[in-house]
């Protein structure tokens, strides 16, 4: 009789272990396979709710005021090459309105690779690769297609550093 009690106890223990393994694996599965987002901060959820009720015009005003308050510069979308043609037509009306501030000192510059010494070509390619974050092949094509705009909206201090570094390597870069 004690054998049957022991056997029953062992069976019960096995079933208990199996059921706890199954339930714990279900909890782990639910946690890792869940697509439900974690609970958001109530303050942020309220802001998101308010923003979602804004119209398109109100949203653009919100974005522009946030950019001005947080000092975020207007960067061209799609990189410097894609933004150059789109920026030219939009700049014409802005130039007429801002004729007086044009006399003030410029703070943002466009850097243009004009030419380079043939002997310094590998060094120039390497520097362009580092500055623009291009691959080696893209950098080589970029340098060989000079004159070409390197960067736009560069602060004066950074622009002067880049021009000096490129001049040391044997390249001519202009600041416009």
Swiss-Prot record:
Localization annotation: Mitochondrion
Gene Ontology CC: one annotated term: mitochondrial nucleoid
GO process terms (BP): translation
Record carries keyword Ribonucleoprotein: yes
Any GO molecular function: structural constituent of ribosome
Chief site of localization: mitochondrion
Family matches, as CDD domains: Ribosomal_L7_L12 (cd00387)
Record keywords: Mitochondrion, Ribonucleoprotein, Ribosomal protein
Keyword flag Ribonucleoprotein: yes
Quaternary data: Component of the mitochondrial large ribosomal subunit (mt-LSU). Mature N.crassa 74S mitochondrial ribosomes consist of a small (37S) and a large (54S) subunit. The 37S small subunit contains a 16S ribosomal RNA (16S mt-rRNA) and 32 different proteins. The 54S large subunit contains a 23S rRNA (23S mt-rRNA) and 42 different proteins.
Protein name: Large ribosomal subunit protein bL12m
Organism: Neurospora crassa (strain ATCC 24698 / 74-OR23-1A / CBS 708.71 / DSM 1257 / FGSC 987)
Gene from which this protein is expressed: mrpl12
């Amino acid at each position: 009789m004690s054998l049957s009690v022991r056997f029953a106890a062992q069976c019960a223990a096995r079933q208990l272990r199996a059921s706890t393994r199954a339930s714990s694996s279900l909890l782990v599965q639910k946690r890792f396979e869940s697509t439900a987002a974690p609970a958001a901060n109530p303050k942020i959820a309220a802001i998101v709710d308010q923003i979602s009720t804004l119209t398109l015009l109100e949203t653009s005003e919100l974005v522009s005021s946030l950019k001005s308050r947080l000092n975020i510069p207007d960067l061209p979308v799609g990189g410097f090459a894609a933004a150059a043609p789109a920026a030219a037509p939009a700049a014409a009306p802005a130039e007429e309105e801002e004729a007086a501030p044009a006399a003030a000192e410029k703070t943002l510059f466009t850097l243009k690779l004009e030419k380079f010494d043939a002997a310094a070509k590998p060094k120039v390619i390497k520097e362009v690769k580092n500055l623009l974050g291009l691959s080696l092949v893209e950098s080589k094509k970029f340098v060989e297609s000079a004159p070409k705009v390197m960067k736009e909206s560069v602060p004066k201090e950074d622009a002067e550093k880049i021009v000096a570094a490129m001049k040391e390597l044997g390249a001519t870069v202009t600041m416009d």
